[in-house]
Design a protein with these regions (language model features):
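PLP-dependent enzyme catalytic core of the Aspartate aminotransferase-like
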Residues: 6-7, 65, 69-73, 77, ...
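Short loop-beta-helix segment that forms the pyridoxal 5′-phosphate
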Residues: 85-91, 99-123
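Conserved PLP-anchoring active-site segment centered on the Schiff-base-forming lysine
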Residues: 124-143
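Active-site C-terminal subdomain of aminotransferase-like
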Residues: 207-210, 217, 222-328, 341
Length: 401
């Protein structure tokens, strides 16, 4: 018992040292609870009323009454949970309906649901690829893609972010592989850049590779009808596999999916470990997901409102003198470069009633610190102007503008 106790203390002291180093480097993350539903107008646990400019709530559906009503109805009709994985007794008719609805939205063959997009990516690569195959991955892909690749025995190649010359070089280097899969985010979440899927699919055809896109920051609002980054580039028919989420624009609860060619989805149902060994998506989330997709299939009103809001804020924030990353996406990185300044600006903006977060190394490269603003269709013009006024005041205070 004494030796076990010594071992425990050694582990605890080691972890304390790591936490201390994280704090000393200014990288310690602090959660700021809110006491209201997720929306544009939120209330912090301190009772402060603020405008939320940092949520993935792109279409303003997180607290939409139609989704809430759909979830409540599903609770009454289908119950709270399934207490099972899909292949035992965890598949209800609404799970198949949501999969069919997603397939229709993407015009794909079939769809498989997961607890999250992280799980969808985690269960993708090791299922489809083996040691004689190769993955060519963008250097700025999401952590879930990186972790999913780590679980796979395939050869690994990486190309510079959105760099088509480097991608082609890696495709040439990997020509000994039997199957080659190009993996990319549809939108890179720290910069708001949309992947060059038109050029990626051209290279994939040239070198006989398949293409996988994680469209979590695009599904529902990028492209003229919100079908995502592939629609934006007019290459919907050239993507083999999409992964995405219900946890951002589509209500923001949880749940992910993989959609694409039938043979890929069939194999995932048989062998994808996160799918086989995780509980089924809850009926309430499933039903609300169906409702969200049907809303977006009927009208582009929310997507169009988001586009209008994004263009307005990008134009006005640049006009104030702030440096932002160029683009069209509602992710708008406002550059401070200095990590400490980013944190101070975020704190000052909170006092002005604007809830944003500073991002810095290791989330972004060193000396690339920023405030990441995320625009929503739920924002009114007065919301946007209030934020712009606050940014102007704080920007002048810290000599950013």
């Amino acid at each position: 018992i004494r030796e076990l106790w010594k071992g425990y203390l050694r582990v605890v002291n080691s972890f304390k040292k790591i936490i201390s180093e994280i704090k000393d480097e200014g990288l310690y993350k602090v959660e700021r609870p809110i006491s209201s539903p997720q929306s544009i107008d939120i209330v912090t646990d301190k009772g402060l009323n603020v405008l939320n400019f940092c949520a993935n709530n792109y279409l303003g559906l997180a607290n939409h009454p139609d989704l809430i009503a759909s979830a409540k109805q599903a609770l009454d009709e289908y119950g709270f949970g399934m207490a099972s994985v899909r292949f035992i007794c965890g598949t209800q008719t609404i799970h198949k309906e949501l999969e069919d609805t997603i397939s229709q939205f993407f015009n794909s063959d079939d769809t498989i649901l997961y607890s999250s997009c992280f799980d969808a990516n985690g269960g993708l690569f090791e299922t489809l690829l083996g040691q004689n195959d190769a993955i060519i991955s963008d250097s700025l892909n999401h952590a879930s893609i990186i972790d999913g690749i780590r679980l796979c025995k395939a050869q690994r190649y990486r190309y510079k972010n959105n760099d088509m010359d480097d991608l082609e070089e890696q495709l040439i280097n990997s020509q000994n592989a039997e199957i080659r899969l190009i993996a990319t985010d549809g939108v890179f979440s720290m910069d708001g850049y949309i992947a060059n899927l038109d050029l990626i699919t051209t290279l994939a055809k040239k070198y006989d590779a398949i293409v996988m896109v994680d469209d979590s920051h695009a599904t529902g609002f990028i492209g003229k009808t919100g079908r995502g980054s592939a629609e934006y580039h007019n290459v919907m028919d050239k993507i083999d596999i999409w992964t995405s989420t219900l946890g951002k624009a589509l209500g923001g609860a949880s749940g992910g999916f993989t959609t694409g060619r039938k043979e890929f989805i069939d194999l995932l149902r048989q062998r994808s470990r996160p799918y086989l060994f995780s509980n089924t998506l809850t009926p309430a989330i499933t039903s609300a997901g169906i409702k969200a997709f049907k809303m977006l299939s009927k009208s582009t009103e929310l997507r169009d409102k988001l586009d209008k809001n994004t263009k307005y804020f990008r134009r006005e924030i640049s006009g104030l003198g702030f440096e932002i990353k160029n683009g069209e996406h509602p992710i708008i990185p406002i550059m401070t470069y200095d990590a400490l300044i980013a944190q101070k600006v975020a704190s000052a903006l909170l006092k002005e009633g604007i809830y944003v977060i500073g991002f810095f190394y290791p989330v972004v490269p060193k000396n690339e610190a920023r405030i990441r603003v995320q625009i929503s269709a739920g924002m009114s013009l007065s919301h946007l102007d209030q934020a712009l006024d606050a940014f102007k005041k704080v920007g002048e205070k810290f000599n950013i503008i």
